[in-house]
Amino acid sequence: MGWKSLAVGTCIALIGGCTSTIPEQPAAVDPHWLLSGSAIFGEPVAPSELPEDDILGLAPEMREYLANVAPDARPQQRLAALLKGFEQRDFTVEYRADQTLTAAETYRQKVGNCMAFTVMMVAMARELGADAYFNQVEVPPVWGHDEEQTFVVYRHINMVSESNRGRRVVDFNLAAYDPVYDQRELTDNEAFAQYYSNRGLEWMAQGEMREAFRYLRKSLELRPGNSDLWANLGAFYSRNGRNTAAEQSYLQALQLDSRHTIAMSNLERLYRQQQQFELADYYAEKARFHRERNPYYLYYQARNAYEHGDFKSAKRQLKRAIWQYENDHRFHFLMGLTSYRLGDYENSKTYFTEAFSLVDNPATERAYSRKLDYLMKRP
């Protein structure tokens, strides 16, 4: 079954939208002003200043390396040989969360995050003649935050190559990859927009604000309808004390996606800092409403409670998560662990059985078996 509460939640949201009005309607959003940079730099940033990174470009040494990978084989066989070489550590990339790089930079520096690794792999796979595309895994977005507790959005991206023999997923951390999540193919432009946004946030963290803006604006030039990118631009303006521009950026994100909880949370913080408590409370309540109907938010709340030994609270959150979405094995496995900790061994067995029935990833199944073996051996 899917999201059981979707229809009910939609009705409640519509009714709530009629009865709960914004305390004071903010000023209209001006996207052109936000994208000009005038709010922070005093004058518009010229289009000629925007970056044009050669994201998928191959360095000569990359072409040389790939030319020697099963040169006489078919494209999918060449890709398989490339990946086998990675597994045997013929070539390695060290994970760095704050390193969004081009394909050539990733290859030369041998470091990068999931975006950098995926960019490199897509470029390499296509050079070998294999079909390859960017794939967004619809896990709950990763919420980073800067020193002022303003949330920003990162999405998990990997590579998919399809052939008549099936679908091959290439992920920086394939052991943790889980096909239970919805996934969708991204166009190159969609992936590039996320690349530029990531790099913009990295420049922001380093205090290089003009570089940060150039990259964030470039991302929105590619995908002006992406609410995540507007929320990240808002975080940039907030970081620099440009509250009106931050407010408008978050409101633009909400115009594009009325359930964007990160934009809501950032508006709440912004209004609270400005002592506009009525507006702050309004957006806090809106964010709470949507989060508490998100089974993944409930799951992460339950996991946090479990890790802190609050098993009763974990059980309450998991019951709500499973009621809303019962096809995620992790919900059932954690409920099994929680029930076991509470001494409810019969129910724990039921939940563990359900978890294993939903798993279709051998690596996950092995990980669960190891956890259970460890649990049973503990006094």
Language model region names:
Residues 198, 232, 266, 300-301, ...:
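Canonical tetratricopeptide repeat
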Residues 220-221, 251-255, 285-289, 319-323, ...:
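Conserved structural position within tetratricopeptide repeats
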Residues 94-230, 235, 239-240, 244-258:
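Long, contiguous interaction/recruitment modules in multidomain scaffold/adaptor proteins
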